[in-house]
Amino acid sequence: MINSISNTVLLKSVVSKRFFSSSAKMSSQAKPRHLVSMLELSIKELESLVNRAAYHKQQIRSGLVNTTQPLSGKTVSLIFNKRSTRTRVSSEGAAAYLGGCPMFLGKDDIQLGVNESLHDTTKIISSMTSSIFARVNKHSDIQEMCKYSSVPIINALCDTFHPLQAITDILTIKESFGNTTKGLKLAWIGDVNNVINDLCIAALKSGIDVSIAVPSGLKFEELILSGAKEISAENGTTLKITNDPLEAINGANVIVTDTWISMGQEDERLQKLKQFEGFQITKEMISKGKAAENWKFMHCLPRHPEEVHDEVFYDEERSLVFEEGENRLYAAIAVLEGFVVNKGKLL
């Protein structure tokens, strides 16, 4: 979970010239639909994906066997530049559930931007597989892969967006509050990163008011902020950003945080801990902030004690973290079904 990158990277595709094949040409076939962020989904499309995830969860938990196997005989590739627990297991599980064969390709397995350009690697892998789950470092990498892939690219995390987690979180909230999200309030206490970028958009599209508390000096990129404000105005939801966790928590039904120190930021640990002083979620904070009586806690994991106290994280009545983690599987199934099996037709 890395801080948002600059608008120039968001608004322009950056194509690396290193090792670029001069003879490469774009295919004339119709371009597939990709999942990059929550910004690209309509309100109805997001709702449909969440509902399909809930459906598959009910089927699996009921012990019903998926006999359709729509991806039978097809390979689903997972290109991961970063290590992962939930994303890898859920993506491979989703492919297997739909009858496909998952193929994991880590940074030590392929020549991803090292001895071969990202352009050439994407062209080759997409010619052999049905789809690509891409967990990469830079948002520009996702943009470049989408530009040159002949199959759907599913953003499994980049430094700006995390759409699979956002779909998961809306599913978790919906099933925890009487199968509805309308009129709820979500409080985010933590960093400005890829998780809240997509969760904020998804929540506002789902009828959830959003209040965000971040340390002084941290800012959202304008593309995210302007998109969130536009959605808020259109959908009748509210967005508030503050530096005070107690202010954000006031009246919140859902309290969410995430890691403060992402992969690759380990050298910044001491600086980060100082920056986030007073941001650990405790029951005292929740009480002082006057959260709603039915408040629940969420965290996409992995979790560290400085982010949230054990009394909150392991509270079986309040904490949804393990249900949330399991729901990653059903979100991945819904996305794979929607973007690969149904070729991006979500409604």
UniProtKB/Swiss-Prot annotation:
Subcellular location field: Mitochondrion matrix
GO terms assigned for molecular function: amino acid binding; ornithine carbamoyltransferase activity
Enzyme class: transferase
SUPFAM superfamilies (alphabetical): Aspartate/ornithine carbamoyltransferase
Biological or metabolic pathway of the protein: Amino-acid biosynthesis; L-arginine biosynthesis; L-arginine from L-ornithine and carbamoyl phosphate: step 1/3
Major subcellular site: mitochondrion
Keyword terms, alphabetized: Amino-acid biosynthesis, Arginine biosynthesis, Mitochondrion, Transferase, Transit peptide
Catalyzed chemical reaction(s): carbamoyl phosphate + L-ornithine = L-citrulline + phosphate + H(+)
GO biological process: arginine biosynthetic process via ornithine; citrulline biosynthetic process; L-arginine biosynthetic process
Pfam families attached to this UniProt entry: OTCace, OTCace_N
Sites where the protein binds carbamoyl phosphate: 84-87, 135, 162, 165, 300-301, 328
Gene Ontology cellular-component terms listed: mitochondrial matrix
Name recorded for this polypeptide: Ornithine transcarbamylase, mitochondrial
Originating organism: Pachysolen tannophilus (Yeast)
